[in-house]
């Protein structure tokens, strides 16, 4: 009788014991930092970035000697970097970037001499850049930006003075 109880106990708890001992690599990564592949481009600071779907985009920046205008796409599923079409505007650092409706946007920044206020759209499907209406605020760098409900927002930053103004951009109306 005691052997039957032990057998029933083992049969009942064996799946729990086995599943508790299983190792799922994905679980090991939840809530932890882990290294992914290094970008193939130049090391840099003051770059800009946005995400579309499961891909991250890194644009422009400064390598310590020059301002950059390259664009890189990180594919999180493949853990790979691919160079995309270079940003056609003035090379810069400290620009803002955001995604709105599956397109990326980049604008403002500093080219070493001028505070910039131009604004550009990146289409990842066609790998092309198109200039959009200039940002109506003063040229600036170090601003903040985000995309919400089909609009891009840019504000704050520095143009010789610290700023707190905000503007919204409607991609459909290009204004």
Residue ranges of each PLM-predicted region?
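Kelch-like beta-propeller repeat domains
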Residues: 11, 15, 21-175
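Hydrophobic, helix-prone linear segments
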Residues: 5, 18-19
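Bacterial N-terminal signal peptides that target proteins for export
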Residues: 1-8
């Amino acid at each position: 009788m005691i052997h039957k109880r032990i057998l029933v106990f083992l049969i009942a708890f064996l799946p729990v014991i086995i599943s508790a001992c299983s190792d799922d690599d994905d679980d090991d990564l939840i809530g932890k930092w882990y290294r992914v592949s290094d970008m193939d481009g130049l090391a840099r600071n003051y770059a800009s970035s946005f995400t579309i779907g499961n891909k991250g985009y890194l644009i422009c920046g400064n390598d310590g000697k020059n301002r950059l205008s390259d664009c890189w796409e990180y594919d999180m599923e493949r853990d790979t970097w691919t160079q995309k079409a270079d940003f056609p505007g003035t090379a810069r650092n400290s620009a803002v970037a955001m995604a709105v409706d599956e397109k990326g946007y980049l604008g403002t920044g500093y080219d070493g001499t001028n505070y910039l206020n131009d604004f550009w759209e990146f289409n990842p499907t066609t790998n092309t850049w198109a200039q959009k209406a200039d940002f109506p605020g003063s040229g600036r760098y170090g601003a903040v930006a985000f995309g919400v409900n089909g609009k891009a927002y840019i504000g704050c930053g520095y143009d010789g003075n610290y700023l707190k103004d905000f503007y919204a951009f409607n991609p459909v109306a290009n204004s």
